[in-house]
Structures are given as structure tokens and as C-alpha cells.
Amino acid sequence: AVTDNEIVPQCLANGSKCYSHDVCCTKRCHNYAKKCVT
């Protein structure tokens, strides 16, 4: 069975730790703070 997580990619909310833009819901990862931003 295919789970919802495999259908819809999980994304990180603003303020979440990130290392790439793709992982953030807003597609913007702050280069220095390493957090998703709007």
C-alpha cells in the first residue's frame, strides 16, 4: 500500500532547521540561520 507520505512530500514549516530550499514549504532556506523562511 502507498502511504500519504509517499504521495505528498513532507515540507518543513517556517523556523524549522533546513539545509536546502527544497525541504521547506516556502522553498526558502536561510543560508546562515539554517531555518526555513518566508
UniProtKB/Swiss-Prot annotation:
What is the recorded name of this protein?
A: Tyrosinase inhibitor
The subcellular localization recorded is: Secreted
Quaternary structure annotation from Swiss-Prot or TrEMBL:
Monomer.
Q: Where does this chain mainly localize?
A: secreted
Q: Which UniProt keywords apply?
A: Disulfide bond, Hydroxylation, Knottin, Secreted
Q: What is known of its domains?
A: The presence of a 'disulfide through disulfide knot' structurally defines this protein as a knottin.
Q: Which residues carry this modification: 3',4'-dihydroxyphenylalanine?
A: Y32
Post-translation changes:
Contains L-DOPA (3',4'-dihydroxyphenylalanine).
Taken from the UniProt record, the cysteine pairs bridged by disulfide bonds within this chain are C11-C25, C18-C29, C24-C36
Sum up the protein's function in the record's words.
Potent reversible, competitive inhibitor of tyrosinase (phenol oxidase) in the nanomolar range.
Identify the species of origin.
Musca domestica (House fly)
Q: Which residues form the signal peptide?
A: none
The record's Gene Ontology cellular component field reads: extracellular region
Q: Which domain of life is it from?
A: Eukaryota
